[in-house]
A protein has these predicted regions:
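Alpha-helical membrane segments of multi-pass proteins
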Residues: 2-3, 16-300
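Hydrophobic h-region of N-terminal signal peptides that target proteins for export
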Residues: 8-17
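Sec-dependent signal peptide recognition
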Residues: 1-9
Length: 300
């Protein structure tokens, strides 16, 4: 029984090692594209935003500048989503841990904050007619829905969810499960993006809320610290955490440990800088405007 267990554990690694020999000769299978449901959701999010913007534009004479800025933020975030989920980077993540880290960082520290700044919920709502907007608004005002949304977007809860998603999925058993299963991989990316959206909404979207900018700066700083700690663990480790990658990073000229160290550095340095930069921007705005944030910008 023990031999059977060891065989089953080693089988995926052996299969991938065999694949590498063929791929080293032919080159990695990289290209644009994604699963149909990913492409559908990307297209739907953009179409609804454009429809909402078109419907709201004639009614917003005094706020068109803000709408243009929000649309630019959303467009940039949407492009980052496409880059992370439908570009060759997605396929490269199955060959190299470092490419996978680039993909995750794009989702969490580029796409997510840009989408939050784009205020998509309001624009998506305006994509529907008056009756549809009233129906959706009535549904979201139900006590259970409001309580759930309030709990998810409470700054401490959003911070904890983002922390838990990041650390849980980098546990070797969980990360390798995502490598071995398309369903688990989709769940991993969904949890990364969803938790990052909640985190950035708590930091940026609720500006002027009870925690204020001081609290937002603390959440950004502590996130920089724990993500940097995880990146440092990858960088300084003397052994590979994810054997399922095997020698596939050789396709990009990297050994397994070099690939892992590069991935750790990507999470540690550029990833940490993004949280630091966001915190410094909020701090500068806080000092410029005074401790009382402008409540007019608190909601989409």
């Amino acid at each position: 029984m023990r031999r059977l267990t060891v065989f089953l554990a080693v089988l995926p690694v052996a299969a991938r090692a065999h694949d590498v020999q063929a791929e080293l000769a032919s080159g990695p299978a990289l290209g644009w594209g994604a699963e149909w449901w990913v492409l559908m959701l990307l297209a739907l999010s953009l179409l609804l935003y454009a429809a909402g913007l078109a419907r709201l534009w004639p009614r917003s004479h005094l706020a068109r500048g803000r709408l243009v800025r929000q649309a630019a933020w959303f467009g940039a975030g949407w492009i980052m989503l496409v880059l992370a989920l439908a570009s060759p980077l997605d396929a490269a993540g199955s060959y190299a841990f470092s490419a996978h880290m680039v993909q995750h960082e794009i989702l969490m520290i580029m796409a997510a904050p840009l989408l939050v700044l784009g205020r998509p919920l309001a624009l998506w709502l305006w994509a529907f007619g008056a009756a549809g907007r009233l129906g959706i608004a009535a549904a979201t005002r139900r006590p259970g829905v409001r309580a759930a949304w309030g709990a998810l977007t409470a700054p401490v809860n959003a911070w904890l969810l983002h922390f838990a998603a990041l650390w849980m999925w980098h546990v070797p058993a969980c990360f390798q499960a995502a490598l071995a299963s398309n369903g688990m991989h989709a769940l991993q990316h969904t949890s990364f993006l969803a938790s990052a959206l909640l985190f950035w909404w708590a930091v940026l979207g609720r500006e002027g809320g009870t925690h204020g900018r001081g609290g937002a700066i603390i959440y950004l700083f502590t996130t920089m610290m724990h993500t940097g700690a995880l990146g440092a663990l990858f960088t300084m480790s003397g052994s590979a955490w994810y054997p399922l990658y095997g020698n596939r990073a050789q396709l990009f000229g990297l050994g397994p440990l070099e690939d892992q160290q590069l991935g750790g550095l990507i999470m540690w340095i550029p990833g940490g800088f993004a949280y630091l930069a966001a915190g410094l921007v909020l701090c500068a705005r806080w000092l410029r405007q005074g401790p009382g944030p402008r409540t007019a910008e608190a909601r989409p």
